[in-house]
């Protein structure tokens, strides 16, 4: 029987891997520059965690979660997003005792049962950050700054930042009544999904992709913000303007998760069509308390790695290619192979990527393989070389060849690679943001 990958998943290999290295390395580098520390949470959690945080009536909980009952009779869900698990870990491990604010970043797979298409998979990967313990508008600005710096580090140009404030619970109470009154007069003109949301989560009607014109004419949340939320939002806009972080206000921006309050933002890329959102987030001031902790204001964002890679490819950005083989060691005979392994180990300790033959092929076949791998140098060890305690070092770029004694081969190779501008590239590629 031949097995195939499950629908909505992909195998990542070959020419795609450098793009993943590129995006993930940049994500980590920028997060570290802002003082964030990595957090790793389980890929599955109790189902109630997501029902309580994301929202019982959201599309994620209603339609998209991978949920199962384990052998102990517990309802378990593969994580559809990373914020709730991070807050759960923060509370469970009493990280509040470490002082506030706490800054975390994560990279990992998420799972949602959606219709697979470009930029939307059932297993997808996210880079996310969470800043726990600040209600100050400066935290919102710094978070958006981090997002922008991350995208700029990928050399992306064709993106736009959209922001909105959806207020606090008090603001939204009056706003929801205004929305309900408005949509009651347009009920016959909204889609079936919106009719369901009308009863369960009326603010999500603003996010409808079918009845766009109806949503455009709906009341604006900005008219219902309390003084505190309005001041908070105005402070954010002023600081972003002062910092020359260009943004667009979008009064229909509400986000699809119930835990958001006040600031919400999305960053969209013009080349990705329907799946144009490459990064999104906002403030979730009530989530810690909702999950059994103290009332701790927090915010963050998540960015889909797959969509970022699509954006990088769409802009034809040249990315660093990770080295798989700088040096290939071709050996003939058992004793030569032992020596090849010794030399390879010496080079690897100097951070040089090396591949040695392990198939006992002919010298011609080995050199052909070295060329196919893109090696810069080939070290050749045969019976004659063993007898003289030397190797042949062939520069595959210039087709020149030199004889070098065993004791000096590592230093010779390092000097030669330095001339070619490749010394140590295996562990240093991508460190310049």
Curated annotation (Swiss-Prot):
Keywords: Aminoacyl-tRNA synthetase, ATP-binding, Cytoplasm, Ligase, Nucleotide-binding, Protein biosynthesis. InterPro entries: aa-tRNA-synth_II, aa-tRNA-synth_II/BPL/LPL, Anticodon-bd, Anticodon-bd_dom_sf, His-tRNA-ligase, HisRS-like_core, HisRS/HisZ, HisRS_anticodon. GO terms for cellular component: cytoplasm. The keyword Protein biosynthesis applies. It comes from the Bacteria. It catalyses: tRNA(His) + L-histidine + ATP = L-histidyl-tRNA(His) + AMP + diphosphate + H(+). One of its GO terms (biological process) is histidyl-tRNA aminoacylation. One of its GO terms (molecular function) is ATP binding. Its EC number is 6.1.1.21. CDD domains: HisRS-like_core (cd00773), HisRS_anticodon (cd00859). Pfam families: HGTP_anticodon, tRNA-synt_His. Belongs to the class-II aminoacyl-tRNA synthetase family. This is Histidine--tRNA ligase.
